[in-house]
Design a protein with these regions (language model features):
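N-terminal export leaders
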Residues: 9-28
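Active-site mouth loops of central-metabolism enzymes
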Residues: 60-70, 141-155, 319-327
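Conserved, mostly hydrophobic/aromatic
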Residues: 46, 58, 88, 127, ...
Length: 405
């Protein structure tokens, strides 16, 4: 174990190449490592977040949420660290995902207050969680409003503390001094009721109000203030605030435009090679986020596995998790390149179903190699060619989560 940890703390260099295509790679479903050379993972600056992020981040779903019996999700997280991935994603609606991070973080000495706490390593990564609870206080119901959590709390601060306890604390509500999240996203902003709810009390915060939205509450926990009356200890538990969305570009644009104080610094958005078959993100909300200098994270690169054998529906059981690497007809590399060359995108989070000592069979290694691409590496013609490839997946009808044109 000592040698294992020493390698990890030195941030072991991983085989990568910024010119993989020129290295003469296979056109098959996986990348041949034979001619790749060692270099550090490619990074991009995440807008106003001002963090140099690796172009691949670890998604908090796949085997971290729906864990097959023969998969160890903790090893997936540790392998991502070994591979120098520095963006890590989870959520309060991802089942055991946050608890798996806790087990990995304890091996990595990332728990504040514990002997050997590695603060330098903690500062080198970006940990994001999410809350789909729309209110900081009170609340109301409207058709279409998403307001859910895997926890027992009813409000955004409950989810925030739940994450800190599950990842850094005892899992029962307590968390150590010095624990924090780099960002909290308001999860799956899908309709105008979601926007209206989170913005309650944003312009004029009154602690006497019956209802206060999630955003005003999260601002208090970012700034260490108590304008809402919901943070009496004036704790500073998060560094940045953002939101995620899969469905509606107009709703997501409204989310950004209503933010007169420029609080929102990050956006997690569904973007893949079938995007233009739907009410697309790449020509609508992503340019708005880019114009606001937000950090933009791509998700659903493989349409939650629907680009391959999985049905075009939400994953709900471990048997639905995709364990393979691409296909001969639709190489995963091309889909990753598409998302990462979409203007405005800084990184892509991809959930991992399976890791392997065989590089050709290891989703994490293959995804990381494919992510070594510059933002302008593909021409418009190149991107259209990838879109044609993506049409071979269910005739392009993969993005069940995205609104139609």
């Amino acid at each position: 174990m000592t040698n294992f940890m020493d390698k990890r703390y030195s941030r072991r260099r991983f085989i990568k190449s910024a010119a993989l295509t020129a290295a003469g790679l296979s056109l098959g479903p996986y990348i041949n490592l034979g001619k790749a050379h060692a270099s550090e993972p490619m990074k991009r600056v995440m807008g106003r977040l001002d963090f140099e992020v690796t172009t691949l981040g670890l998604g908090g779903q796949a085997s971290l949420q729906w864990t097959p019996v023969d998969v160890d999700p903790i090893k997936i997280i540790l392998k991502a660290f070994d591979s120098e991935v520095n963006y890590f994603d989870t959520s309060n609606v991802y089942g055991p995902s946050q608890s798996y991070y806790s087990k990995a973080f304890r091996q990595l000495n990332l728990i504040p207050g514990q002997p050997g706490y590695n603060e330098r390593l903690r500062r080198s990564i970006f940990l994001t969680s999410k809350t789909a609870l729309r209110f900081g206080k009170g609340g109301w119901q409207k058709p279409g409003l998403i307001n859910v959590s895997n926890g027992t709390g009813r409000h955004a601060a409950d989810d925030l503390r739940r994450t800190l306890s599950l990842v850094f604390g005892d899992g029962q509500g307590s968390y150590p001094k010095g624990a924090y999240l780099d960002m909290v996203l308001m999860h799956s902003i899908s309709g105008m009721p979601d926007v209206d709810a989170v913005y309650e009390g944003y312009e004029s915060t009154d602690p006497r109000a019956e209802t206060i939205g999630a955003l005003a509450a999260l601002i208090d926990f970012r700034d260490g203030t108590n304008l809402t009356g919901l943070n009496p200890g004036e704790e500073k538990l998060i560094r940045h605030i953002g939101f995620s969305g899969h469905a509606s570009p107009p709703v997501m644009i409204e989310m950004i435009q209503r933010d007169s104080r420029r609080i929102l610094e990050g956006m997690l958005v569904a973007i893949n090679a079938n995007d233009r078959n739907y009410f697309n993100m790449q020509y609508n909300v992503i340019p708005v986020a880019e114009a606001n200098n937000m950090g933009v994270i791509a998700m659903k690169v493989f349409a939650d596995g629907a680009m391959y054998a999985k049905a075009a529906t939400w994953t709900s059981i471990p048997d639905m998790v995709v364990l393979g690497v691409g296909s001969d007809i639709l190489p995963s590399r091309r889909l990753i390149e598409y998302s990462l060359t979409t203007p405005g995108i800084h990184t892509a989070i991809i959930g991992i179903g399976h890791i392997d000592d065989d590089a050709a069979a290891c989703q994490l290694k293959q995804n990381l190699l494919a992510a070594q691409i510059k933002p302008d590496a593909l021409s418009v013609s190149d991107r259209r060619d990838i879109e044609k490839l993506a049409l071979t997946a269910k005739e392009g009808k993969t993005n069940y989560f995205q609104n139609p044109i």
